[in-house]
Amino acid sequence: MFRPIAAGIVAVVLLTACAPEDAGDTEPADFARSVCAGLTSWRDGVATESAELTRSLDGANDVATVRSRYGHFFTSTVRRTDQLIHTVDTAGAPKVDHGRGYSRDLTAALKSARSGLASAQKSFAALPTSDLAGYAAGARKIRDSLGGVLTQVGTTLDELGQTYTSGDLNRAFGDEPACQRLSGT
């Protein structure tokens, strides 16, 4: 009678010891697909809107027009980032060692980028509107500073790959076409 119970306890202990530590519930391939599709959509959307902004400003000769177009750009970029954060949250955490930590750190990095974008949006709204040339120069400077915010997302992804060294997760990211498009491979 005690042998089946003892064998059951040993099996539970062994299974627990072999289970990934701090793992999530999402298969690595599903996680990579969701995250990279979200990141690709975000990156492409921001790039398209930035190019459209540049084209739309050609010939703009009043502060109201310039302000409106930049306002649309910043609002769209913050909204896209909110959508990306939601996508990553919805993806859950990968079922790998420290998958919850990976997901948590990725979400924190995206929230930091969102904060930087929202800060740029506030700086933009505070620009003086009395001089078109000065206003446009200030707006361009703020927009150009966004490059650092956006680049930080890519840097964070690289750092996460080095910090969380799950072979299964790295393989899933490497095999996922959306991730390959992000990395240019």
Where is each model-derived feature located?
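Generic structural signal for well-ordered, non-transmembrane alpha-helical segments
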Residues: 33-47, 68-82, 104-118, 137-151
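Immediate post-signal-peptide N-terminus of mature secreted/exported proteins
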Residues: 21-76, 178-184
